[in-house]
Amino acid sequence: MRTKIITEGTTKIEVPVPDENSSFPPSSVSVFYNPEMQLNRDISVAAIASFSKNAPEYTYLDALAASGIRGLRIANEVGLTTSMSDWEEESVRLIEKNITLNSLKNCTAIKRNANVVMLDNSFDIIDLDPFGTPAPFLDTACRSVRKLLCVTATDTAPLCGAHKKAGIRRYGAVPLKTDYYPEMGVRILMGAAARTLARNDKAMTPLLSYASQHYYRVFVEVKKNVISADECLNQMGFVSQCFNCGESRMQNGLAVHIEKECPECGGKTTMAGPLWLGSLHDRDFCDDVLEECEKRKFPRAVKLITLCRDELDIPMHYDYHKLCKSLGLSARPTQELVLTLGERGFEASRTHFSGVSFKTDAPLREIKKIVIQLNS
């Protein structure tokens, strides 16, 4: 295996060099390093630094370490006691070399199955960052974690409805391919975490979640409390979507009655869920993370988290371009629509999900009227 030494953040790491003509993920190397996920890791460093700033004794597990870059950065740049587990012998050897390369005394490399590691040990912070679905590791992670659970899912198609049956199997929820599909995916992932934690009498508070490139990422604070776990489940629910007029409605609860006909146009409605209908972000936490990102000079992370922090705290969003297309109109600047909605007495904001997405508490019929007026 050919390797080279790179620097990410302030951490040096020896990483494998795949063949130039290899596929992605590269089959030519047994240890996987993905440079495209640096934004994910930058945000993780800032978020975990913010979360643990008054608790330097917290322990951190990178459950699916691969090259070890995530755990190495947490140990080196945040200073937490870090464990990194991987089943591959070459991964563990490379992680141990990188621990020495960075002169880290607070790191351990473990050659074991991630689920076994989490069954045998508890950690304050657990990070699941698989290539693919986190579903096979969610049960043991929720059992083992004490304070903060961080989860990445790169299987976006099952989460957002493109591969519906896979979504049902993996996450115990019916996904739906809608105009707001990235948020659908994040909320199904969040809902799966909430239900799995509740089975272990634990509650969660979402601190930060986002969709970026080809993955979804969530950070949730964990609390062992039966009453809080019950209250957490009250924020689960379902979405009723009409594909005829575009109307979507949310209904809280795990056993709900969804009208089969759209109350706006009489068209057939389709149900998605159960999924998380509560907040996706904690604004105070986002402020702390932004401060860390600015201090550490993570400009891409600053831009993304600023959008997350400033999003309207309601479920689901609209795609302005698709809305205009359905009305046979050309789209004007999204910010113009957001400002106009505010002038008409509604709450509205841009979102991080796309450059043309927005959230508002205005009814869809009012949004359509305003869009038509802006184009007249």
Feature names for model-found ranges:
Residues M1-S376:
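SAM-dependent transferase fold signal centered on methyltransferase-like domains
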